[in-house]
């Protein structure tokens, strides 16, 4: 069973920005990127605790996890709240691994 999911408004902009860049590189590549992001989100919603811990609170509890996208150097970072998965950021893992950590909710 999968958790319902939403994207933080800035995560939506993350996807759009990367989609535009990939589309400029090669038509259709942006669409493949969006499919890869969607697949990562579905994986996370099915197995929310399987993602790699990404951010911890002051007590050492996992606050956010991350899952890589297949075929692209991007990952999604998400948190699980109230039986829902919230995608907080979609980011390039090599360029800015701490991108979006200041997004609270």
Model-flagged regions — what are they?
Residues 1-64, 81-84, 98-105:
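Basic, Lys/Arg-enriched alpha-helical interface segments
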Residues 69-105:
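Enriched for short, Lys/Arg-rich terminal
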């Amino acid at each position: 069973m999968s958790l319902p999911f939403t994207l933080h408004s800035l995560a939506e902009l993350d996807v759009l920005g990367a989609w535009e860049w990939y589309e400029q590189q090669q038509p259709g590549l942006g669409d493949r990127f969006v499919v890869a992001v969607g697949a990562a989100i579905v994986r996370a919603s099915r197995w929310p605790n399987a993602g790699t811990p990404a951010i911890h609170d002051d007590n050492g509890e996992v606050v956010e996890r991350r899952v890589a996208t297949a075929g692209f150097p991007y990952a999604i970072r998400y948190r699980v709240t109230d039986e829902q998965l919230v995608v907080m950021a979609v980011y390039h893992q090599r360029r800015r691994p701490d991108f979006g950590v200041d997004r609270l909710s």
